[in-house]
Amino acid sequence: MPEETAHTPVTAFMLVKTTPEWLALTVEERVHAFTTEVVPVVRARTAGVRSRFYDTEFYSARVTDVWVWEADDHHAYQLLVDALRETPFWDRYFEVVDLLVGTENGYARTYGVDAVTTLST
């Protein structure tokens, strides 16, 4: 893998669906499970990752949430997925329906042109 590619930031859109086991927990039990079973593993096994979590169950029947992860590079993202797979998050509390992974403005970076597809109004 070329050095530039290895250190390119990665964004992952993790499309997930809650499981009946997760929904059977009270809100307090969910917060406790997440903060004691998932967060410590991610913090211990990763560096250079950030996340945002979006509720989508009122807009989609296919997925209930979208977890957006930004990683400093491919290796940081790989460590994140490996860490999550070792927790009840993966397949017990949530079904990972799809992973959409990319690099922001990769085309512009590859060809050395302005990122004309990134807009702000």
From Swiss-Prot:
- Per the record, the domain of life is Bacteria
Pfam families found in the cross-reference section: Darcynin
Q: Which family does it belong to?
A: Belongs to the darcynin family.
For this entry, the protein name equals Darcynin homolog
